[in-house]
Amino acid sequence: MPPIYINIILAYTASLVGLLMYRSHFMSSLLCLEGMMLSLFILATILSLNLHFTLSFTLPIILLIFAGCETAVGLALLVMISDIYGLDHVQNLNLLQC
């Protein structure tokens, strides 16, 4: 396995561990999700360039579109939560109140 794949998998794992461990603020959770999406995008781009399949070139673009949608929804939720509650702590959110 080339070292670039190991680095990308380690970046994904570090973002996943950050998402699971540092869940106190909503903004830090969003940043960890963006790190995961960035590492998946780089991995999909490198794999599609190495495989030379014509249909696989659209996979990174579709992944980038979903990452942009996830970012927009996450920032909209962050603005709404900070406007309603005054802070972005995840512990203060309760899904039963919505």
Curated annotation (Swiss-Prot):
Core subunit of respiratory chain NADH dehydrogenase (Complex I) which is composed of 45 different subunits. Belongs to the complex I subunit 4L family. It comes from Galeopterus variegatus. One of its GO terms (cellular component) is mitochondrial inner membrane. The chain crosses the membrane at residues 1-21, 29-49, 61-81. Its EC number is 7.1.1.2. It holds the Pfam family Oxidored_q2. This is NADH-ubiquinone oxidoreductase chain 4L. It catalyses: a ubiquinone + NADH + 5 H(+)(in) = a ubiquinol + NAD(+) + 4 H(+)(out). It is a multi-pass membrane protein. One of its GO terms (molecular function) is NADH dehydrogenase (ubiquinone) activity. The keyword Membrane applies. GO terms for biological process: ATP synthesis coupled electron transport.
